[in-house]
Swiss-Prot record:
The beta subunit is responsible for the synthesis of L-tryptophan from indole and L-serine. InterPro entries: Trp_synth_b_CS, Trp_synth_beta, Trp_synth_beta/beta-like, TrpB-like_PALP, TrpB-like_PALP_sf. PANTHER family: TRYPTOPHAN SYNTHASE (PTHR48077:SF3), TRYPTOPHAN SYNTHASE-RELATED (PTHR48077). This is Tryptophan synthase beta chain. The keyword Lyase applies. Tetramer of two alpha and two beta chains. Its cofactor is pyridoxal 5'-phosphate.
Length: 407
């Protein structure tokens, strides 16, 4: 299958596009032009590759999780260790690329939205490196959940704006960042943290994150002597770590691709963020994608234990993969993610982010189904330091509830 997406208008099949007001159209067209010029300039990629090597610490290892594999007794599990990047997650791949692009465009200020805080930290880090002013928009609820990352961003010289609109989470932070961009277009670049938003953002983010899949593909061959794994697994909120892993394999049709969505308390409740399981096409933040919405087209609140996954949409390329049945998207509950979090910590000595724990939880199920002759690559998108206090509180609360039930 020859895969050519997106087309010149930014569509991935029937998803994507550029649904923005006139005030933003100039900015996204300017961004697309600058991005195309950077792609055609070998010095841009050389500089970025050097930064990824020397500053971020790439390439990240592809690690055979022998203990986990033996514990499950199924398919071989290889972890793509994005948690070992500088700043602790995959987000730096995109942030560094976009700040470098903004610098070339002559921009002076950087703005970004963040949920779990990882994209905010990565953007603040890249802005500090390039000596640029930086403001991060973060929902007030997430500011409370991720106090440590808020302090990190401030330490790195960024200003953190707590967003009090709506449900005070990630989608509200995106709205606030877009409003700020409209008001300051001349000297400011907006760094979207996931493969979302109006074209060319989903393409730019995918391209900067595809280093994950390109490395993993070669590393798998070097490690195993085999050509391709049988499956890929990654968590999906907006979907940038997943698209980064999937895209270099999209034409390898023997490789099954699975995105683990946040099912919160369960997809039959109102508390989840399982967009491809329960959503339908709609326009959100400048792009046509699958969205959680009610019968009147109003955007529903997304919910997850993981601040990085509670977004009510998903990147348009994921909607396209789902539509053409190239990838499968599966719901994983908070409870299952917590089990994955504890299991990987216990058997491999690796504490995963709550986001990545959704991928681990599904990988455990899939490994049992596939059996020992098969193998998979799981994207460990980030480390769990930021989540340890939240997990401790949740497990203690759950234990107290169980104690009351038995009393």
């Amino acid at each position: 299958m020859a895969y050519q997406e997106p087309n010149k208008d930014g569509f991935y099949g029937k998803f994507g596009g550029r649904f923005v007001p006139e005030t933003l159209m100039t900015a996204v067209l300017e961004l697309e032009k600058a991005y195309r010029e950077s792609q055609a300039d070998p010095s841009f990629q050389e500089e970025l590759n050097q930064l990824l090597r020397q500053y971020v610490g790439r390439e990240t290892p592809l690690y055979y999780a022998k203990n986990l594999t033996q514990h499950i007794g199924g398919a071989k599990i290889y972890l793509k260790r994005e948690d070992l990047n500088h700043t602790g997650a995959h987000k730096i791949n995109n942030a560094l690329g976009q700040v470098w692009l903004a610098k070339r465009m002559g921009k002076k200020k950087i703005i970004a939205e963040t949920g779990a805080g990882q994209h905010g930290v990565a953007t603040a880090t890249a802005a500090a490196l390039f000596n640029m002013e930086c403001t991060i928009y973060m929902g007030e609820e997430d500011v409370k959940r991720q106090a440590l990352n808020v302090f990190r961003m401030e330490l790195l010289g960024a200003k953190v704006e707590a967003v009090t609109d709506g449900s005070r989470v990630l989608k509200d932070a995106v709205n606030a960042a877009l409003r700020s961009w409209v008001a300051n277009i001349d000297d400011t670049h907006y760094i979207l943290g996931s493969a979302l938003g109006p074209h060319p953002f989903p393409e730019i983010v995918r391209d900067f994150q595809s280093v994950i899949g390109r490395e993993a593909k070669q590393q798998y061959r070097d490690l195993t002597g085999q050509n391709l794994p049988d499956a890929l697994v990654a968590c999906v909120g907006g979907g940038s770590n997943a698209i980064g892993l999937f895209h270099p394999f999209v034409e390898d049709e023997s490789v099954a691709m699975y995105g683990a969505e946040a099912a919160g308390f369960g997809v039959d409740t109102e508390h989840h963020a399982a967009t491809l399981t329960k959503g339908r096409p709609g326009v959100l933040h400048g792009s046509l994608m699958d969205v959680l919405q009610d019968a009147h087209g109003q955007i529903l609140e997304a919910f997850s234990i993981s601040a990085g996954l509670d977004y009510p949409g998903i990147g348009p390329e994921h909607s396209h993969y789902h539509d053409i049945k190239r990838a499968s998207y599966v719901p994983v509950t908070d409870e299952e993610a917590l089990e994955g979090f504890q299991l990987l910590s216990r058997v491999e000595g690796i504490i995963p982010a709550l986001e990545s724990s959704h991928a681990i939880a599904f990988a455990v199920k899939l490994a049992k189904e596939l059996g020992p002759e098969k193998s998979m690559i799981v994207c460990l998108s980030g480390r769990g330091d930021k989540d340890v206090v939240q997990v401790k509180d949740r497990l203690e609360a759950d234990a107290a509830k169980k104690g009351e039930a038995h009393a």
